[in-house]
């Protein structure tokens, strides 16, 4: 089985990083293929912005992220970092999200990952 572990903690040597290391050791020992996606180490940009879509056909004075995501997904023209993350999701049979709870929620980098990678019109729709 292909396992993707998405780590959202700024310190790789943290308790969360240790949990990832333990999971990798266990999963690899059981014969699985594991890839760790360390959002901080890879400097994933969690902020959705118009600059991610420089070839937009939308009106330049208004940025509507969901429409941009859908249009660029359909044109296979999403930003490179999002395409990389989507390829990882396609590869994975199992995805594990490892993160601390800060103020009763996930870290902002992971929230931004959800916002940018779970592309409207591609990974989900409102229907």
Q: Can you describe what each PLM-predicted range is?
A:
Residues 1-99, 103-123:
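N-terminal beta1-alpha1-beta2 submodule of the flavodoxin-like/Rossmannoid cofactor-binding fold
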Residues 125-127:
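Short, intrinsically disordered, charge-balanced linker/junction segments flanking boundaries
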């Amino acid at each position: 089985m292909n396992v993707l572990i998405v780590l959202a903690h700024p310190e790789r040597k943290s308790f969360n990083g240790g949990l990832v290391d333990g999971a990798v050791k266990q999963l690899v020992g059981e014969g699985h293929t594991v890839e760790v996606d360390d959002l901080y180490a890879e400097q994933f940009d969690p902020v959705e912005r118009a600059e991610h879509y420089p070839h937009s056909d939308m009106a330049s004075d208004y940025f509507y992220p969901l429409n941009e995501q859908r249009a660029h997904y359909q044109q296979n023209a999403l930003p490179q970092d999002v395409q990389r993350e989507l390829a990882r999701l396609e590869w994975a049979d199992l995805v594990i999200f490892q993160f601390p709870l800060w103020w009763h929620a996930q870290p902002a980098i992971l929230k931004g990952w959800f916002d940018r990678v779970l592309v409207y019109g591609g990974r989900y729709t409102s229907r």
